[in-house]
Amino acid sequence: MSSNGIGLQTARGSGTTGHIQKNVASNKDHASIKDDKSGHFRRRQLSNDRKLKYDKHISTRNNRDEAKQEIRSHDLKRDVEVKCMELRDALEDESEEELTIEKKVNELRDKLLNSPMTARKQTSLDDRKSDSSHASYENKINDHKDNDNASKNDIEDSFSYKRRYTDCDEKGERLKIRR
């Protein structure tokens, strides 16, 4: 019956079940602000503290979102540079001149950075399985937004296989089944 050393060791002989209850009457921290008659200053101070805490929460969330965007753009630029280095290595193996190599590498870099695929951030990272937690987070948010915009029919179509096909007739209309 004892929990963390609180309460009876055993309920035997005590005439009780040994159930332990928390005494919330003695806790003054949980009194609501409206019931607090200690004064206007104290209520206003508590209200301001809540507002500051909320503002701090919003600012940290915005900072995290900005950091995620910066990381994604850095990953994108890094992939572009990897492709440029691969081209440079291939051209150096073919014994091209340095000026020609620089020109071709710069053309490829400009092409990759200015392409519409890159602008939409859909590079080779999206083609393969994403190793980046930030990319998977962005995809999850986009999927969630798409689901929010779905119509009622789309939502009904997304029910599980068992529910869709076992409770419907040949025309796809729901059967009234009592369970």
From Swiss-Prot:
Principal subcellular localisation of the protein: cytoplasm
Location(s) in or outside the cell: Cytoplasm; Nucleus
Ranges annotated as biased composition (Basic and acidic residues): 27-39, 46-72, 123-132, 140-155
The keyword Ubl conjugation belongs to this UniProt entry's keyword annotation: no
Gene Ontology CC: one annotated term: cytoplasm
CDD domains: cwf21_CWC21-like
Compositional bias (Polar residues): 1-26
Coiled-coil stretches: 59-157
All residue ranges annotated as the CWF21 domain in the record: 72-115
Pfam families in the record: cwf21
Keyword Coiled coil: yes
Keywords attached to this entry: Coiled coil, Cytoplasm, mRNA processing, mRNA splicing, Nucleus, Spliceosome
UniProt subunit comment: Associates with the NTC complex (or PRP19-associated complex). The NTC complex associates with the spliceosome after the release of the U1 and U4 snRNAs and forms the CWC spliceosome subcomplex reminiscent of a late-stage spliceosome.
Family: Belongs to the CWC21 family.
Functional note: Involved in pre-mRNA splicing. May function at or prior to the first catalytic step of splicing at the catalytic center of the spliceosome. May do so by stabilizing the catalytic center or the position of the RNA substrate.
Protein's name in the database: Pre-mRNA-splicing factor CWC21
Species per Swiss-Prot/TrEMBL record: Debaryomyces hansenii (strain ATCC 36239 / CBS 767 / BCRC 21394 / JCM 1990 / NBRC 0083 / IGC 2968) (Yeast)
Gene, per the UniProt record: CWC21
